Amino acid sequence: MWSKIEENQTVEMTVNLRRICSRLPWTKKASKVVRMLKREIQKHFREEIGVVVTNDLNNFLYSRGIKKIPNKVRVRVTKETSLKNAEENVLKTDLVVVGSFKNLKEVIVDQ
């Protein structure tokens, strides 16, 4: 488990969405899993700053409809300055398309 992510550092990680939303009702599951994904990333990196989900990742989460979400997703998390406020930092999450999730570990891509 990573303790803190530094400025302009990029980390790729796999998030098990089935585990995150196991207790959610099947109605409006995709909209709630976006909030749960943001909370999971904040908890993983021990950060209290905001998390920005890109359009590609959001479209992937809604690709099977609002009731059926994907089981796992591979994301690339980068700590950047906010577009709204230059003094604040945010965790930006991008979608990483992979063929299989087998034997994928967390890796630091850029520093």
Curated annotation (Swiss-Prot):
<dbReference type="InterPro" id="IPR023621">
    <property type="entry name" value="Ribosomal_eL31_dom_sf"/>
</dbReference>
<protein>
    <recommendedName>
        <fullName>Large ribosomal subunit protein eL31</fullName>
    </recommendedName>
</protein>
<dbReference type="GO" id="GO:0005840">
    <property type="term" value="C:ribosome"/>
</dbReference>
<dbReference type="InterPro" id="IPR000054">
    <property type="entry name" value="Ribosomal_eL31"/>
</dbReference>
<keyword id="KW-0689">Ribosomal protein</keyword>
<keyword id="KW-0687">Ribonucleoprotein</keyword>
<dbReference type="GO" id="GO:0003735">
    <property type="term" value="F:structural constituent of ribosome"/>
</dbReference>
<dbReference type="GO" id="GO:0006412">
    <property type="term" value="P:translation"/>
</dbReference>
<comment type="similarity">
    <text>Belongs to the eukaryotic ribosomal protein eL31 family.</text>
</comment>
<dbReference type="GO" id="GO:1990904">
    <property type="term" value="C:ribonucleoprotein complex"/>
</dbReference>
<dbReference type="Pfam" id="PF01198">
    <property type="entry name" value="Ribosomal_L31e"/>
</dbReference>
